[in-house]
Design a protein with these regions (language model features):
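Canonical Rossmann dinucleotide-binding motif of NAD(H)/NADP(H)-dependent dehydrogenases/reductases
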Residues: 2-34
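A glycine-rich helix->loop->beta "capping" turn
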Residues: 53-56, 76-87, 106-109
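Substrate-binding pocket helix/loop in short-chain dehydrogenase/reductase
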Residues: 98-102, 106-111
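The beta1-alpha1 cofactor-binding region of Rossmann-like NAD(H)/NADP(H)-dependent oxidoreductases
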Residues: 40-41, 61-72, 107
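A short, exposed helix-loop element centered on a Lys and neighboring polar residues
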Residues: 125-126
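Conserved NAD(P)H cofactor-binding loop of Rossmann-fold oxidoreductase domains
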Residues: 90-98
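Active-site loop of short-chain dehydrogenase/reductase
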Residues: 7, 56, 83-84, 132-139
Length: 139
C-alpha cells in the first residue's frame, strides 16, 4: 500500500501479540517500525524477526508508565527515521489488578493496571503526537 511507504509508526507493546502483528503488517507495507516494549528478551526476538523480513526497525526497551521513556522513544524514532507519522498505543496489562473479584486485589494492583493501561496511553500521546503533527498530521 503506497500510503505506508516511508512513513514511521511507533508501536508500544510491540514485541509480541497484537502489537507485533501490527508492526509486522505495516512493516511489510513499507513503514519504518519503532517497537517499544518492557521485555528486553522478547524485544530482541521481535527485532530480529522484523529485520530478517527486511522491515526497517528500531527496537527500544521502554516502560509505558514512564513519561521519560516515552520521550526517549520519540527522540530515538526521530533520530533514526526523521519523522513520526503514526502511533499505536498497544502496551497494556490484564493481570493481577484487573481480573477476579475486586475485593481480592490491592490498591497497588489497580494503580499498576491504571498506570500501564491509562497513563501509558496519555504519556504516549503527549510524547508522540506533537511529532505526528510536525510531520503533517499523519498522512
Amino acid at each position: 500500500m503506497e500510503l505506508f511507504k516511508g512513513k514511521t509508526v511507533v508501536v508500544s507493546g510491540g514485541a509480541e501479540g497484537i502489537g507485533f502483528a501490527v508492526a509486522q503488517a505495516v512493516g511489510r507495507e513499507g513503514m519504518n517500525v519503532v517497537i517499544a516494549d518492557i521485555s528486553p528478551d522478547t524485544l530482541a526476538t521481535a527485532e530480529a524477526t522484523l529485520s530478517e523480513q527486511g522491515i526497517p526497525v528500531l527496537a527500544l526497551t521502554a516502560d509505558a508508565r514512564s513519561e521519560a521513556d516515552w520521550d526517549r522513544v520519540a527522540d530515538a524514532a526521530l533520530g533514526r527515521f526523521g519523522a513520526i507519522h503514526a502511533l499505536m498505543n498497544n502496551a497494556g496489562v490484564g493481570g493481577s489488578g484487573s481480573t477476579g473479584p475486586i475485593e481480592d486485589h490491592s490498591a497497588e494492583d489497580w494503580r499498576w493496571t491504571i498506570d500501564v493501561n491509562l497513563m501509558g496511553v496519555v504519556f504516549g500521546l503527549k510524547s508522540v503526537v506533537p511529532h505526528i503533527k510536525a510531520a503533517g498530521g499523519g498522512w
